Amino acid sequence: MSNVRSKICGITRIEDALAAAEAGADAIGFVFYAKSPRAVDVRQARAIIAELPPFVTTVGLFVNASRCELNEILEVVPLDLLQFHGDETPQDCEGYHRPWIKALRVRPGDDLEAACQRYAGARGILLDTYVPGVPGGTGEAFDWSLVPARLGKPIILAGGLSADNVGQAIARVKPYAVDVSGGVEQAKGIKDAAKIEAFMRAVKQA
């Protein structure tokens, strides 16, 4: 049985958040990036969070958001953790009185160890697929052999994961956590409860 943590990202509906919690997800993610098909506004996020059971971590995903925009969201949405998924510098990620993680889009030749050291204040590093011009949510996996055995920070593995490949991904990378969005959807932004259950079952059995 696996102790790998899990996050269901791109939640836009209360029923999907509850399905994730019921299936045993440790965290759910809200995308505050208007260009994403999974984007939510503060009203949606607040309504969903208000219905959550205890012990489900709420994560806000941001892509090159201004400090003003981010602070306005944090004033009204009770987020536990911030996920920076753009080109933010370490300084951009600090100062919000919330723990945070930094997403890196992986491609051959990247020095992931140096990147981890650069984002020293991050609680973890999320590794996602590199697609030019797309900050995330590509639905494509990357070459897991590019991930060093030890990076010095908890690794959250993302990018093209589903019930069919997450067991293999966990065996190969040995991440602290896995992050899924498109792999548990029936349409962009609309989750499928059966796919969430299958994904969580595969994580636990890995």
UniProtKB/Swiss-Prot annotation:
Q: List the disulfide bonds.
A: none
Which GO molecular function annotations are given, in alphabetical order?
phosphoribosylanthranilate isomerase activity
Chemical reaction(s) catalysed: N-(5-phospho-beta-D-ribosyl)anthranilate = 1-(2-carboxyphenylamino)-1-deoxy-D-ribulose 5-phosphate
* E.C. designation(s): 5.3.1.24
Q: Which UniProt keywords apply?
A: Amino-acid biosynthesis, Aromatic amino acid biosynthesis, Isomerase, Tryptophan biosynthesis
The pathway is: Amino-acid biosynthesis; L-tryptophan biosynthesis; L-tryptophan from chorismate: step 3/5
UniProt xrefs under Pfam families: PRAI
SUPFAM superfamilies the record matches:
Ribulose-phoshate binding barrel (SSF51366)
GO biological process terms, alphabetically, are: L-tryptophan biosynthetic process
Question: Which family does the UniProt entry place this protein in?
Answer: Belongs to the TrpF family.
Q: Which NCBIfam families match?
A: PRK01222.1-4, PRK01222.1-6
Kindly give the HAMAP family that the UniProt entry links to this protein: PRAI
Q: What is this protein called?
A: N-(5'-phosphoribosyl)anthranilate isomerase
The organism of origin for this protein = Pseudomonas putida (strain ATCC 700007 / DSM 6899 / JCM 31910 / BCRC 17059 / LMG 24140 / F1)
GN (gene name): trpF
